[in-house]
Amino acid sequence: MKKILILMTFITLISSNASAQDWSISTNLVDYITLGTLNVEGSAATGRHITVNASARVNPWTFHKGDPAKQMQNRQQTYAVGIRYWPWHIYSGWWFSGMAQYEEYNRGGIFSQATEEGDAFGLSLGGGYSLMIHENLNIDFGLSLWGGQKTYISYACPSCGRITNKGSKWFFIPNELRVAIQYIF
């Protein structure tokens, strides 16, 4: 599945023309608050109203690893490819998005000791607004919802290994709260 996403991203990015103001790179500041999730998104314009996007998020951190009562993690690697429609003009004003997303995750110990790990794949729909700060700099605000299927294993705590549930199920959850710094070149 990862190879398919990487191939789709590569084909999408090389198929667009590379003139001025057609490329951007951004990072979502909200992701850093969620236990230090590193993230990047690249975007290429394919016309006046359409951009194609590829993004990745990685969080390898485990906090308080030596203390089972305090251990918490939001470990993940997430990859997405998608498209944005800009009613006015690319990288300016309102936008609507759709994307395919894959995530391998291990979360637990944050709000309770319950921990879940697994793989999730699905589609996301979102929208937002890009505020132009400078000719080459935007602040991008947005929100998206993600639905799909996940295979998972639930544990009683982050470090005990006691399985409480496992299986496969459909999900529909908030995906991304976006306050991103975007550089356009």
Regions found by a protein language model. Give the residues of each.
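Sec-dependent N-terminal signal peptides
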Residues: I4-S16
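Outer-membrane beta-barrel biogenesis signature
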Residues: L5, A18-T27, F185
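Predominantly the C-terminal beta-signal and adjacent terminal strand-loop region
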Residues: H134-F185
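Residues that define the transmembrane beta-barrel architecture of outer-membrane proteins
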Residues: Q21-W23, T34-L38, Q73-Y79, E117-L123, ...
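Solvent-exposed loop/turn segments connecting transmembrane beta-strands
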Residues: S24-E41, N59, I90
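Gram-negative (and chloroplast) outer-membrane scaffold detector with strong preference
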Residues: A44-F141, A180-Y183
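Extracytoplasmic loops and strand-loop junctions of Gram-negative outer membrane beta-barrel proteins
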Residues: D22-I25, H64-G66, G108-S112, C160-K166
